[in-house]
Structures are given as structure tokens and as C-alpha cells.
Amino acid sequence: MNLTFDLTGKLALVTGGGGVLCSGFSKTLAAAGAKVAVCDLRPDAAEKVAAEIRENGGCAAAFTMNVLEKSSVEAARQAIYETFGVSRIDLLLNGAGGNNPKGSTSRDVLTPEEAAELTANGTIEGVKTFFDLDPEGISFVFNLNFLGTLIPTQVFARDMCAEGGTIINVSSMNAFRPLTRIPAYSGAKAAVSNFTQWLAVHFAPVGIRVNAIAPGFFLTEQNRTLLTNPDGSLTPRSDKILSHTPMGRFGTPADLDGVLLWLADEKFSAFVDGVVVPVDGGFAAYSGV
């Protein structure tokens, strides 16, 4: 029995492929034999990842894609098919996403003292409360994470229906346990998890499996200002996170490789559908006591 992950001959598309986690996803899929379409809003970031894959003997090409504009996704689809000489992809990894400061508060909770100051003055200088959240910022976060998953799925899953395929979404531990300060991101990732299950049921009859990976705490460009100080030291929030993570560290992109390849290779996960897999160093299992 061959127990080696092997994606030889498969074409994988990764959105957000120039980011910290998704660049790792792209490289891992290529190392397992897949041809990879690295897609990102930033063409230079996508090309950097694709070039590194090629330098290491893999097959990859970079494409510009705005996951919030269907016309952009459709244009990328045409370019990908022409570049690789195909009429469909085998694996879609919806990795584009992120947060926005306009959808975040600056405090974990609202204290009675702050509530009294709000009542008296209508605002608190230097403090961003729940009542100061910007609806446009909330919309941006929901659109980027939810619509940024839905639109590429609409465009590429249509061509996968005849022969089946695999879709892997990127959710977050925020979807299981909403974190303080980031209500928009927590809610948006909960939507991605729910949508993953919905898609799994919807596409099961045509042989498209849909699952999601839910990373715990990984240092990325989106959360770096919350977790590290300008000098690189950890913030009090990071200390709190690590004290509630039994493994006592942040995750690295390599920590996601096993789950990614398991979900991508149908030889090992053919009967796995509609699951959201946490990779969090034990964070969700720990009650704090």
C-alpha cells in the first residue's frame, strides 16, 4: 500500500497565494506534485511564490486576481486555463481573507467606568469601543472572507461538476470561539465555516468535496500589530494567547501541511466532506483551568 501523498497531474489554484499562510500552501501542494496557479491581488507577491516553486523544480504560474470582483476571477480563470492547457482545475483553495482595523475594538470588554464615560461624553478619547465600529469596515471584512470564498467557488466549481474535485476553504479558530476585539473577523470566519458545510452538502452528488482548515494563532500580516510590538516583542494579548495554548507557541505554516495534504489527496480523504479541521496547538481544548 502506497501511503505517500501524491498530487501528480493535479492542477491546484490558491487564492491569496502571496500571503504568509497561502504561500506555504502553494509550495506544499507543488512539493506533492501538483501544478499550482498562485493567485493574488498583488501580482509581485504571487510571482515571487511561483518563481520559488519553479526554482525548486515545481510547476507554478502567477495570476492577478481580485476575489471580490467576479470579472477579475473570470479573467484569471481564462488565463489559467490557457497557461496550463486545461478546461478545469482539480483543487480550489480559497485562502484570500483578512481583517481590517475598522472592524476591531481596542478593548476586550466594556467596563462600567467606560460605559459611564460614554453616557456622559458620547466617546472615550483614545479608545475604540463597540459603538465606534465602522459599518464599512465590518462590510469589508465580511466581503473579503465570505464573498472572497463564494465568488471563486462560483467561477471554478462550475467546471469541476462533470468530473468532481476538491475545495478547501480557510476558516479560523475564531469561528469556533469568537475572540475579543475582532468581532467582524470572528463573524466572517464563522460564515466561512457554515458555508463550507453548506457547499459540501450541495456539491456531494457531483463529486466535489468541500472542507476547511481552521488555523489557530499564526503570525501573519493581518494580526502582527495585535500580537507584536514595533520592536518585535510580544504584546500582552500574545502572552494571553500563549498561556491558553497548551503547546505554548504560535503555529508556523509547516504545521498546516499535514491537514492540507490529507484533505487535498482523495486517496486519504475520499469520504471526508463538510468538516472544519482545527490546527491550534490545543487552544480550543483548554478551558484555562
Go through each PLM region and give its residues.
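Residue(s) in the substrate-gating loop at a strand-loop-helix junction
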Residues: 172
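Alpha-helical segment proximal to the catalytic Tyr-Lys
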Residues: 158, 201-204
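Catalytic Tyr-X3-Lys loop
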Residues: 109-150, 168, 192, 247
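Active-site helix of classical SDR
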Residues: 153, 188
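Short, small/polar-rich loop/turn modules that mediate ligand/substrate recognition or access, typified
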Residues: 164, 204, 209, 268-273
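Canonical Rossmann dinucleotide-binding motif of NAD(H)/NADP(H)-dependent dehydrogenases/reductases
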Residues: 3-37
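C-terminal substrate-recognition "lid" of short-chain dehydrogenase/reductases
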Residues: 249-279, 284
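Active-site loop-to-helix junction immediately N-terminal to the catalytic Tyr of the SDR YXXXK motif
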Residues: 178-186, 198, 226
